[in-house]
Regions:
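Active-site metal-binding loops of divalent metal-dependent hydrolases
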Residues: 57, 182-184, 205
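Glycine-rich phosphate-binding/hydrolytic loop that grips phosphoryl groups
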Residues: 31-33, 203-226
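A short helix-loop
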Residues: 43-47, 53-55, 60-145, 225-226
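Short glycine-aspartate micro-motif
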Residues: 3, 49-53, 179
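Short beta-strand-loop/turn "lid" adjacent to the catalytic site in phosphate-handling enzymes
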Residues: 1-12, 16
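Conserved phosphate-binding catalytic cores of ATP/NTP-utilizing and phosphoryl-transfer enzymes
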Residues: 25-50, 218
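A contiguous, well-structured pocket-lining segment that forms one wall/lid of small-molecule binding clefts
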Residues: 108-177, 184-201, 220-226
Length: 226
């Protein structure tokens, strides 16, 4: 992605100046390794597992396998076909008058709701669609539903979509460990639901939105095999 080119250029210049090796990887691998580190599950790099990268720009499930050269390889096996999870959350928050980015404030607001929503996510094979969440939220606001109920509905909708993706991937590829990374995975309600259902591992909040630790881990592991 173009936004990463500045960092890549700076790394190339620093490596050349220091006469140090330069290891290149992906933004996604950084998030996955950061999640494994903070969840205390670094040993999973030695076996296949499912990793979810859930943020404002990405809502994907990837099949991760060990690789002798790249440490791990990630193959996308399920994703959102339209709106991303973080977008659904932020757009809901903005519609409710919350400051952007809205995740923590929307979660706090949702905790005031006593509603128990029964939500059937929209699935297209193994992929999910989240565009309907925004439309439903707009309708709820027009119907004068309380803000806390609207907030809880949006978060429950995202959680159920991720759950349905996990079910679809497990059915297709078999039962294996599941790890969640990315900013949205820092949401406690979503994390609690998916941990209960699948025994999923989650990055700690401070490692959910920042993948710098994962990039550092990748560089360390690569240095061991050079």
């Amino acid at each position: 992605m173009p936004c990463f080119l500045a960092g890549e250029s700076a790394a190339e210049a620093a490596a050349a100046f220091c006469n140090a090796p330069l290891f290149k990887t992906s933004h996604q691998v950084g998030h996955i390794l950061a999640a494994l580190y903070s969840a205390g599950k670094p040993e999973l790099i030695n076996e296949p597992f499912i990793a979810f990268h859930v943020s404002g720009g990405t809502t994907e499930a990837v099949l991760v396998t060990p690789d002798d050269y790249e440490i791990i390889k990630a193959q996308i096996v399920s994703e959102s076909t339209d709106l991303k999870a973080g977008q659904a959350i932020d757009r809901t928050g903005v519609l409710l008058g919350l400051d952007f980015p809205c995740g923590p404030a929307l979660e706090k607001l949702s905790n005031e709701s006593n509603e128990n929503f029964k939500i059937k996510p929209t699935m297209l094979g193994v992929n999910c669609s989240l565009s309907g969440v925004e439309n439903k939220v707009k309708n709820m606001i027009s119907d004068n539903r309380t803000p806390c109920d609207v907030a809880k509905f949006a978060l429950c909708s995202v959680a159920e979509a991720l759950s349905a993706m996990a079910e679809a991937v497990i059915e297709k590829y078999g039962d294996m460990p599941i790890v969640f990374a990315g900013g949205v995975s820092g949401n406690k309600m979503i994390a609690d639901m998916l941990s209960d259902r699948y025994g999923a591992f989650f990055a700690k909040p401070e490692f959910s939105s920042d993948n710098a630790a994962g990039i550092a881990i990748y560089a360390y592991l690569k240095s061991l095999i050079q």
